[in-house]
Regions:
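Catalytic cores of peptidoglycan-degrading enzymes
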Residues: 1-99
Length: 99
């Protein structure tokens, strides 16, 4: 799910968890991946700058990155993914007003 935004807009963690990836990854550009436990993972892509590192614990609402257009992106936005047990879920189900 892509969220349009302004350059350097704040990206916040949606739930508590441990950062498992923070850095460039293929078309995602600068990516952050957070393991929330019980098989749940979120990904935040195309970031201008990442503020967290693998192994960091994050809290819900914590600023983890700045929005950008790195990787295969046509403009500034956040690419948001939700995975459960390694399978992509529809992230709109988890975003209020988007279901």
């Amino acid at each position: 799910l892509d969220f349009a935004g302004s350059a350097d807009g704040l990206i916040l963690a949606v739930a508590p968890g441990v950062v498992t990836w923070s850095g460039p990854l293929r078309g995602y550009g600068n990516l952050i991946e957070i393991d929330h436990g019980n098989g749940w993972v979120t990904r935040y892509g195309h970031n201008a700058s990442n503020f967290v590192s693998p192994g960091d614990y994050v809290k819900p609402g914590q600023t983890i990155a700045l929005m950008g257009a790195t990787g295969r992106a046509t403009g500034t936005h956040l690419h948001f993914e939700v995975l459960y047990q390694g399978r992509h879920m529809n992230p709109a189900r988890f975003v209020p007003g988007r279901a």
